[in-house]
């Protein structure tokens, strides 16, 4: 990236997959267009130039391209005849806009622009944005101008830096005590779990007769732990489903179903699709996500943030820990409302939650012991993680 059109008039950057690129490429070749690569992204650049030669208008050309392409995309498009602007578009791929003094930004994640601005807008599917130095104009799928809510990024620039650690994963492992404290402490008050940001009423909670936990990857493993805990606390059937399979399984979901969606980024494509399928069937959607203002957060009926800060390493650490904590708190909160947990068990669990950040900090203080065990085993080519019940889910996460 960027990919450039045949005559160099257009350049495109792209996250996602253009699913019908073969069909479009064959059409363009039949029109005499010469391709430089085998990528799906180049089709967008070539198609832009093809339509621009017909209509002579950058914005109109973008609209025509978007009506032809199928798949998931976050696009940034430039035209040599309009050097003062970038046009952006999204469908099923994260894209946000940053607003600065005399400058505008386009990124797939806030970590890319936090050094320059904290004022962002999250684009939704079908939207188009025109970026100039003077500002940004947003349009809906009908290409009508729209205004959207701005979000302020709360975390510090240092959260997206290594801070003296050799790599982000070690840094994020060591950040777990603080991340857990941020997720837990504001929600504990006078020995009670209090979700100020939860719209669910006790009456609504009592009305659910089925609970699904839906997620992908590590978040799915959190869901497996959640199934054990919630069934114990609520004495209700809880199903955990891989988001990629959920919408194809014809799930039994209706307006008495609570679907708990878990995602660190809030942009996981399969999880988004599962959310929309559940919502279409009438389910109430409660999401547990880390990224404020993300697509899953915006499309849910209710959202609980984990407030773990940016997680840059590929292998999850603090996001996983905070998801576990928040989901456990949800179970305890609901159990108190339903009357399915003894007062003593509830009080003990709340006390343990309050102590959890310090206990994790104490565990991470044994770095030399951890290093010793790692040195004994790191050279093995295969490892079996064996456990049952909660440890089975932990074993799956360890193997991942």
Name each region found by the language model.
Residues 1-166, 171, 175-210, 248, ...:
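Conserved short alpha-helical segments that host acidic/polar catalytic motifs at enzyme active sites
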Residues 11, 87, 212, 258-260, ...:
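Conserved beta-strand elements of the Class I
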Residues 17, 21, 37-41, 55-62, ...:
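Generic structural signal for well-ordered, non-membrane alpha-helical segments
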Residues 176-180, 184-212, 302-400:
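Active-site phosphate/pyrophosphate-binding segments
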Residues 206-355:
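Glycine-rich phosphate-binding loops that contact phosphosugars or nucleotide phosphates
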Residues 7, 117, 208, 256, ...:
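Short, well-ordered alpha-helix to beta-strand connector turns
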Residues 47-52, 258-263, 356-360:
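Short, basic, glycine/proline-bearing loop/turn elements
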Residues 20, 84-85, 95-96, 114, ...:
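Flexible loop/turn segments at secondary-structure boundaries
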């Amino acid at each position: 990236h960027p990919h450039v059109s045949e005559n160099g008039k257009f350049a495109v950057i792209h996250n996602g997959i253009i699913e019908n690129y073969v069909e479009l490429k064959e059409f363009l070749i039949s029109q005499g267009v010469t391709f430089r690569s085998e990528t799906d992204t180049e089709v967008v650049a070539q198609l832009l130039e093809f339509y621009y030669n017909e209509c002579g208008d950058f914005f109109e050309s973008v609209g025509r391209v978007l009506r032809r392409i199928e798949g998931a995309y976050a696009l940034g498009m430039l035209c040599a005849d309009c050097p003062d602007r970038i046009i952006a578009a999204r469908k099923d791929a994260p894209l946000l806009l940053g607003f600065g003094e005399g400058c505008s930004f386009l990124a797939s994640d806030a970590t890319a622009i936090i050094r320059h601005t904290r004022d962002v807008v999250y684009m939704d599917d079908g939207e188009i944005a025109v970026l100039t130095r003077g500002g940004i104009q947003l349009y809906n799928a009908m290409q009508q101008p729209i205004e959207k809510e701005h979000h302020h990024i709360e975390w510090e620039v240092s959260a997206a830096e290594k801070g003296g650690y050799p790599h982000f994963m070690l840094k994020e492992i060591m950040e777990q005590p603080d991340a857990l404290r941020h997720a837990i402490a504001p929600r504990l008050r006078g020995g009670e779990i209090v979700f100020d940001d939860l719209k669910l009423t006790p009456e609504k909670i009592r009305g659910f007769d089925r609970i699904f936990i839906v997620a992908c990857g590590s978040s799915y493993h959190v869901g497996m732990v959640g199934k054990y805990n919630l069934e114990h606390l609520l004495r209700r059937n809880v199903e955990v489903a891989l988001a990629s399979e959920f919408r194809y399984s014809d799930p039994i979901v209706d307006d008495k179903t609570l679907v708990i969606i878990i995602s660190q980024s809030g942009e996981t494509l399969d999880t988004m699709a599962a959310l929309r399928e559940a919502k279409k069937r009438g389910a109430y959607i409660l999401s547990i996500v880390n990224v404020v203002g993300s697509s899953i957060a915006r499309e849910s009926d209710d959202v609980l943030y984990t407030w773990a800060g940016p997680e840059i390493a590929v292998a999850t650490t603090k996001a996983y820990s905070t998801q576990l904590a928040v989901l456990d708190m949800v179970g305890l909160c609901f159990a108190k409302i339903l009357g399915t947990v003894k007062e003593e068990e509830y009080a003990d669990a709340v006390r343990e939650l309050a102590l959890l950040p310090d206990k994790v900090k104490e565990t991470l203080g044994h770095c030399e012991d951890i290093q010793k065990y790692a040195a004994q085993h790191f050279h093995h080519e295969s490892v079996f993680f064996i456990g049952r019940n909660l440890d089975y889910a932990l074993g799956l996460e360890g193997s991942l």
